[in-house]
Each structure stands twice: as structure tokens, then as C-alpha cells.
Amino acid sequence: MKCPACQHNGTRVLDSRPVDEGRSIRRRRECESCNYRFTTFEKVEEIPLIVVKKEGIREEFSREKMLRGLIKACEKRPVALKQLEDICFEIEKELRNQGVSEVKSDMIGEMVMDRLAKIDEVAYVRFASVYRQFKDINVFIDELKDLIKKER
């Protein structure tokens, strides 16, 4: 690997360790020429997963985008970031294990809501109100009634 400081093509690995729950490897390297130290990350190249939106628009799946939506729904709620990251990882893993190249956004939304309902009901309702585009208070009340039924 080329040194980012001097462009020499010889480096040696000083330290390697798994990161991101074993999904990638962090390597600490040193240039054999100038002794500059730098960090690299290695991960498996994944086949793109395409999300088909309600309007038919296609975009690449983004775990970060899903996480941002979850963080917004859980704002000022007692939900740890780690829980939200785990939800995103589980959903992505489940989608990739299906072996399909395209998935509908509705399916992802339902998967998120199922998991969110189990950890925080207020966050679930917040997410559902945006995801399901509640038009009026009656739709909101119906969603709350469904949530109460599921609890029993």
C-alpha cells in the first residue's frame, strides 16, 4: 500500500483488529521509507442493495439514512444509540440474506416500525406518523389503538 505522506509503495502492518462488530478490520501501518504512520480499514465489498421508493424512484440502500430517521424519532427519548445501530444492522443483514437486489421501501419501513415498537412506543408513533404520512388526527388515533392492541 502506498504511503499517503511520501507515496512509497512499501508499508508494514503494526496492528490489526476487528471493528464495527467484526464487519471490518482496522490496520495501523507504518511506511518503510519515511516511518509515517497511518490507519486503513478493510471490509467486504457488498453488492449494492437498491431501495424502490413509493414513487418508483430507485436509490441505493443507506444504513446511515435509516439510522438518521431512527435518531430523529428517538430524540429526547431514553433509547441508546447502540440500540438504534443494532436495529439498522439487523435490518440490513435480513435484507441482504434474502438474496434480492431490490427491496421496496415499504418493507424496510415496516421492519423498522416492528423493532421500534418493541423498544419505545413514543418513538414508534413519531416514526409511524412520518412514515405513514398521517393526514389527520383520526389516523393518528387509529395507529395508537393498533399499538395498544398489540401490547395486550
UniProtKB/Swiss-Prot annotation:
Its function, per the record, reads: Negatively regulates transcription of bacterial ribonucleotide reductase nrd genes and operons by binding to NrdR-boxes.
Question: From the Swiss-Prot or TrEMBL record, what is one GO molecular function term?
Answer: DNA binding
| Pfam families hit by this protein | ATP-cone, Zn_ribbon_NrdR
Recite the UniProt keywords alphabetically: ATP-binding, DNA-binding, Metal-binding, Nucleotide-binding, Repressor, Transcription, Transcription regulation, Zinc, Zinc-finger
Q: Please tell me whether the keyword Zinc is annotated for this protein.
A: yes
Q: Return the InterPro entries for the record.
A: ATP-cone_dom, NrdR-like_N, RNR_NrdR-like
The record, for PROSITE patterns, names: ATP_CONE
Where in this chain does the record put each ATP-cone domain?
Answer: 49-139
Source organism per UniProt? Bacillus licheniformis (strain ATCC 14580 / DSM 13 / JCM 2505 / CCUG 7422 / NBRC 12200 / NCIMB 9375 / NCTC 10341 / NRRL NRS-1264 / Gibson 46)
The protein's required cofactor(s) are namely: Zn(2+)
Q: Which family does it belong to?
A: Belongs to the NrdR family.
- Per the record, the zinc finger regions (unnamed) lie at 3-34
The record's remark on the cofactor is: Binds 1 zinc ion.
Name used for this protein in its record? Transcriptional repressor NrdR
- One Gene Ontology biological process: negative regulation of DNA-templated transcription
